[in-house]
UniProtKB/Swiss-Prot annotation:
It comes from the Eukaryota. SUPFAM superfamilies: WD40 repeat-like. This is WD repeat-containing protein 55 homolog. The keyword Cell membrane does not apply.
């Protein structure tokens, strides 16, 4: 290592005495000159300017690039360094704030908010281009963002949602709440718009239905009243005050003139819009009526109850038609399938019971189901049903023969209500989390019929996620890997040097 000539090792101790103060002064002067040259270099000057520091002024007596060097060239170790860490950080921060302000102004000019969504239908992601990205993950995220929605976004309310119902003709959905209000939303794939909120009941509105022409809303409540309200004017058209002696739980519209109600004590009543009082009433069970329905002929009215009975009423004769044997579980829901030849009922133990139409005394077939309570059922096609309950999953199943087709959608909490729109393409569900989610189920149109002797894996079917589900299947990931491997193998197969064949 080269040494400065003033610091060469002395030959003996006498040479140390020969070093005088002039030599020390000379060394200090050289160090001062080196520091001064470095501080005045062009590179350091540009670096400081780029970091936001003020440009050094000319030698006019007001300032210098390094205040630690005095005007006479002497070095003052106690002088304050103008380029200290604190000053540099403050100036860099001010420069960064200016850059952030410019970015914010540019974002406002482009019209894209920080939230990425709004009443106008959401943010504009057209400027994103996945072709410019090399990272596969980033490209996948951009592609998912730009992918058009196939179902409306989620609706979130502050109050508990007790029931939902689609309009028979328009893209409108009614949401009944626990405080007695009904919210009407116009839904679309890009946004949902609140049309109006109708205050109908003093207590919880338990069920809401549209009339067949879609002009009026029928609601029942815990306050024992039934109300018919004009959907457009919000005016009350008819009030059935104290329609039942107990809280009303279910409604069912038969046609343009008739509708039925069922209460918590098991009483069923049939009403005519043109009259003030009920046409008839029957009490054949002692517990809550959970669901009511009829077929197209409207000759029989069926009702399930929480005490395990399927009760059938003859509408024309206004009397009991038949009542099933009691079940040791609640019958919560039902649907008609196979050309109105089969009735399927769901239970609190997750079972599905099948009845031949007209023979409702006892079931002809039973499917173990999903081992989780089934509280809701909606027919999607003549052979496919969607069921939901306390586990928060909406599952599709094939009727006669029974097969689990997979999971249609999910909620984080138990599902409270389920309905399908007039076109049969959109399914809506509400949960205990005060939310309504939409699921596009149009893909069921392409499902083929299932044969009785067809082999299947019940374990995989129960956990399989359908296209509308927010979850993906692990097998889909490995299927893509297999596909890529097959493509590579096919490319290599065309090369004679790819390797020896395994064929013997």
């Amino acid at each position: 290592m080269d040494r400065h000539e003033h610091f060469k090792a002395p030959a003996n101790e006498d040479e140390l005495d020969d070093i005088d103060d002039d030599m020390v002064v000379g060394v200090i002067a050289e160090i001062e000159q080196e520091v001064l040259n470095e501080s005045e270099s062009d590179d350091d000057e540009y670096d400081l300017v780029d970091m936001g520091a003020p440009e050094p002024q000319q030698a006019d007596g007001h300032s210098s690039s390094n205040e630690s060097i005095s005007s006479d060239g002497s070095f003052d170790p106690n002088a304050e360094d103008s380029d200290s860490d604190d000053s540099m950080i403050d100036e860099a921060a001010s420069g960064g704030a200016s850059s952030a302000k410019r970015r914010k102004e540019q974002t406002a000019t482009d019209g894209v908010g920080a939230s990425g969504s709004g009443a106008s239908g959401g943010a504009d992601y057209s400027h994103l281009d996945d072709d410019d990205e090399t990272d596969e993950t980033v490209r996948a995220i951009i592609a998912a963002i730009k992918k058009p929605r196939s179902a409306p976004p989620e609706i979130k309310l502050e109050d508990f949602i007790t029931d939902i119902c689609f309009h028979p003709d328009r893209d409108i959905i009614a949401l009944a709440t626990i405080i007695g209000d009904v919210h009407l939303y116009e839904y679309g794939n890009e946004e949902n718009k609140l049309l109006r909120t109708i205050e109908v009941h003093a207590k919880a509105c338990r069920d809401v239905e549209f009339t067949e022409d879609g002009r009026s809303l029928i609601t029942c409540s815990k306050d024992k009243c039934v109300m018919v309200t004009d959907m457009e004017t919000e005016k009350l058209k008819k009030l059935y005050e104290t329609a039942h002696d107990d809280a009303i739980n279910k409604l069912h519209v038969l046609d343009e003139r008739l509708f039925a109600t069922g209460d918590d004590a098991g009483t069923v009543k049939l009403w005519d819009f043109r009259t003030k009082d009920a046409i008839f009433e029957l009490k054949e069970v002692e517990d809550q009526i959970t669901q009511m329905l009829t077929n197209e002929q409207n000759k029989l009215l069926l009702a399930t109850s929480a005490d395990g009975y399927l009760t059938t009423y003859n509408i024309g004769a206004r009397k009991l038609y038949v009542q099933s044997e009691p079940y040791e579980e609640e019958l919560n829901c039902m649907g008609i399938y196979r050309g109105s030849s089969k009735l399927v009922a769901g239970t609190s133990k997750g079972r599905l019971y099948t009845y031949n139409w007209g023979y409702f005394g006892y079931h002809c077939d039973m499917y173990p189901g999903i081992k989780s309570p089934i509280s809701l059922m909606i027919p999607i096609t003549d052979r496919i049903a969607c069921v939901a309950g306390e586990d928060g999953n909406i599952r599709a199943c094939h009727i006669a023969p029974y097969r689990n087709l997979g999971v249609v959608g999910q909620h984080n909490m138990p599902i409270e209500s389920l309905d399908i729109n007039c076109s049969g393409e959109l399914l809506a569900s509400s949960s205990h989390n005060n939310d309504v989610r939409f699921w596009n189920v149009k893909y069921f149109e392409d499902f083929g019929d299932i044969k009785y002797n067809e082999k299947h894996n019940a374990y995989k079917e129960k956990r399989h996620n359908l296209p509308s589900s927010k979850c993906t299947n692990a097998s889909d990931f490995f299927a893509d890997m297999t596909k890529d491997q097959d493509d590579d193998d096919n490319d290599g197969g065309n090369d004679t040097a790819a390797g020896p064949s395994n064929v013997t």
